[in-house]
From Swiss-Prot:
Protein name in the entry: 5'-deoxyadenosine deaminase
Residue sites binding Zn(2+) per the record: 64, 66, 212, 300
Cofactor note: Binds 1 zinc ion per subunit.
Organism taxonomic ancestry: Archaea, Methanobacteriati, Methanobacteriota, Methanomada group, Methanobacteria
A Pfam family reported for this protein in Swiss-Prot or TrEMBL: Amidohydro_1
UniProt-listed GO biological process terms: S-adenosylmethionine biosynthetic process
Cofactor(s) annotated in UniProt: Zn(2+)
Pathway(s) it belongs to: Amino-acid biosynthesis; S-adenosyl-L-methionine biosynthesis
Subunit structure: Homotetramer.
Amino acid sequence: MTDNTILIKDALILNPLDFKEIKGSLLIKNDKIAEIGTDIDESNVDKVIDAKGKILLPGFVNTHTHLSMTLFRGLADDLSLDSWLNDNIWPMEANLTSEYCYIGALLGAIELIKSGTTTFSDMYFYMEDVAKAVEESGIRAVLSYGMIDFGDDEKREHEIKENIALFEKCNGMADGRIKVFFGPHSPYTASKDLLEDVRWLANEYNTGIHIHVSETQKEINDSLEAHDLRPFEYLDSIGFLGPDVVAAHSVWLSHNEIEIIKRNNVKISHNPCSNMKLASGIAPIQDLITNDICVGIGTDGASSNNNLDLIEELRTASLLQKVNLLNPKALTSNEALAMGTIKGAEVLGLEQEIGSIEVGKKADLILIDTNNANMVPDSSATSSNIIYSANGYNVDTTICDGKILMENRKLTTLDEEEIYKKARKAIEELKEASK
């Protein structure tokens, strides 16, 4: 069997491990980075990509989203989280089918690929159909079933069976691009019994946990009333936390909770645009980073963002910390770019495979075209130009697992127009069913 080889030639290579800028080339063999240098032999290469004027980066890592909810983009804007969920999203979700979730996931996958995200972490329903969309699109994913029981024993057993079935069917699927976590929705929708069961299951299956924690002030107040403890204090008291836990949002944190997060090596997914849009609050990201806590970036769903552009999310994260702390040096462009790449990979336990440009790592890579009005002149550091000037439309090429998913802004694995047509039809049907 011969190797499939791609040479990315004459790029400006930026590695988020050290932020050194190298003008050179990179050779991909099959699914991995095989060589990085300035004089790579191209005589026997299957394909050469001319990357002059382009920045070569690791693919972005979106550590928290709900891909199928891309169908709900713009559905319930300008509302609080409580009203958004209870009065709009949950009633609409009651009419979801596996086909709708599949279409929504395909639509989301298009947006991810076209804005340079090669890996995403998702918690939702009908996740086997999301896995199908992942397999077809060519991207990488960490999937979990959103487990909610509200203290109902029968419901708890059902939710556990659903997530176990997802693990047994989909973990390692799509040539190993899919990894499955357990996904208790939150401390306020998952009972103590469910949370304790999930902790045991994650240990038993040697996998991670994906959960929403401390997203709103109401959640804090409700937790104090129910348990006389804040959410992270409560989770710590029942032995739930650990280095395999990814806590999305983590907005309202006390000093004690930051210590709890650090002691348990919990990973954090920061979702600034969603937190701003729902007026949930501003997460203390600079404090977390200063305390050596691993923080990645997430978009949340397009229903509360309203897009999946990770460059926009990283810029927002940086600017939000600066204005909140009145410190222009808070969350620098280097720190932000690391959040979107190597730190995101670490959040998902994938830092040995993706997130940086190193020989032997998976060939999850993107090219950003600097020959655009918003990128000229490029007199600042490259990371600054990406974080403060670029957007997803500047991504020219997206490669995942050594396969080209987009080149010259053209997708290679998905039929955009057909998916757009199906998505428009699906949301109209859902609106009609929800009347």
